Amino acid sequence: DDLMVMLYGMERFDVDGDPGKLKRLADHLDVDGIDGIDDSDGDRRIASVQGLKEAYGFAASRFIVEQAEHFVADHDKELLICLLCPTATEQVLRGQPRYDQGFANYLRAAGHRVFDMNEVHRQDFGDFSLSVEDYRKRYWMGHYSPAGNHFFAHSLKDTVIDWLEPKPRTYRGDAPSSADFDGYLPTPV
């Protein structure tokens, strides 16, 4: 009954789906062009399934972000959203449009603090004369390698520092002095 599992199975393993349920999902998500889901044209069917799967996934992601917004508001917290998707990274490295651009735009338009590692990789890739495959070998081994983890952490550092208040002592720009904990510890009553 899980529609995402159904869509994934249709896309990856050519299983039959339930066109009626998927049509209702498409109507709910206001997705056009899913007529090919029950079509005998394999390419059209896959394109329809992928389009609906992505729309459903991003709708679920927007819902999760909305729930996180409520949580942080209720608990006087702040939210930082980090974007890193191997598919989107591959697309930006190849100069192609990102499949998740609409979601990235949604996050920014909603005023969220967003760290987009896909764009960091795009900028970094521009500093090299490497093929996409050779660039990916620097940071990935099926998932991030230790070098990839280090690159991510180092790239995220300034975003976190800009977010923190008070800033960590080493990033305050003050002259070296003894460490203090102003702003970090509660003030005695």
Where are these regions (language model features)?
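Serine-dependent acyl-ester chemistry module
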Residues: 1-112, 117-128, 168-189
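Histidine-centered active-site loop/cap adjacent to the catalytic His
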Residues: 136-175
